[in-house]
A protein has these predicted regions:
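NAD(P)+-binding Rossmann beta1-loop-alpha1 motif at the extreme N-terminus of oxidoreductases
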Residues: 1-56
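Rossmann-like NAD(P)-binding element
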Residues: 42, 56-117, 125
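Rossmann-like dinucleotide-binding cores of NAD(P)H-dependent redox enzymes
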Residues: 35-69, 159-167, 182, 189-197
């Protein structure tokens, strides 16, 4: 990328639910996409889920067979960070830990070309802090996709203190090029969505914990009564109960809002290994590991 145009995209953490969804968005929109994760087995499993998603899209007449084939051809995988060296944009969707994300960006700075933009898919952490010490703070931007990324159009775009206007404008234009709908938000915990959703989801968990209603009835009330496509407990299962705890741990110390504190039921379920879709059991049970939607 010498003219501000993004042509090749890397996704770090591409074997995860969010990362694989982001890779679908990129490849489907016509961009060469390099998927990085730490193990080949995880990448192979993600590839199978991705191809299954494309197959469903064809079956539902949302994609032609030719478009499916082209999208699959645009996807490649690597377990080496230097496989992302010539990408114009690298989107990280790794574990929601400041230390992990900072270390990744430092390593990417060592291997990627000078023009590469780094985008963080963090949902809670400060973009300014993530970028700190990476060596190209002016070329780091927040780019928060919503789960499932391949179906949800919204992206929350957040500049850090050092993010250049050119970086933000280029990243903003790219989100539109892949068919997403960006909104700009300040670099604050939770940005827009999670600042509202984390307490709301916790309230739903507490309602189940207090015996107000079953998880299914809480979700049904929200979907039918408020017109939501997904109930809060279905959403927590999709995001991961462990991730919901991480969100709480990021929010509560900053806001001191009691609604942002992790409910005891949530902690007990995570301790029992009930993490939602990823483990096969959360507020609901699941009988397979398939890509959401199609």
């Amino acid at each position: 990328m010498t003219d501000g145009t993004i042509r090749k995209v890397g996704v770090a953490g591409a074997a995860g639910t969010m990362g694989s969804g982001i890779a679908i968005v990129c490849a489907r929109a016509g961009f060469e996409t390099v998927c990085y994760d730490v193990t080949a087995d995880a990448l192979d499993a993600a590839k199978a889920r991705t191809q299954g998603f494309f197959d469903k899209s064809v079956a539902r007449n949302k994609m032609t067979k030719e478009a499916r084939g082209a999208a699959v051809q645009r996807l490649s995988s690597t377990t080496q960070l230097d496989g992302l060296a010539d990408c114009d944009l690298v989107i990280e969707a790794v574990f929601e830990s400041l230390d992990v994300k900072q270390a990744l960006l430092r390593h990417l700075n060592d291997v990627c070309k000078d023009a590469t933009i780094f985008a963080s898919n963090t949902s809670t952490l400060s973009i300014t802090e993530i970028a700190g010490g990476c060596g190209r703070e002016d070329r780091v931007v927040g780019m928060h996709f919503c789960l499932p990324a391949q179906l949800m159009k919204l992206i929350e775009m957040s500049p850090g203190v050092s993010t250049s206007d050119a970086t933000f404008d280029t990243a903003w234009a790219w989100t539109k090029a892949v068919g997403q709908l960006p909104v700009q938000t300040q670099d604050k915990p939770g940005f827009i969505l999670n600042a509202l959703l984390v307490p709301f989801n916790n309230d739903a968990i507490r309602a189940v914990e207090a015996g107000v209603a079953s998880a299914a009835d809480v979700d049904k009330a929200i979907k039918v009564g408020l017109g939501y496509k997904m109930g809060p407990l279905e959403l927590v299962d999709l995001v991961g109960l462990d991730t919901q705890i991480l969100l709480c741990e990021a929010f509560y110390p900053v806001t001191l809002d009691p609604r942002a504190a992790a409910p005891p039921l949530l902690k007990r379920m995570v301790a029992a290994g009930h993490l939602g879709r990823k483990s096969g059991r959360g507020f609901y049970t699941y009988d397979g590991s398939t890509m959401f939607g199609g």
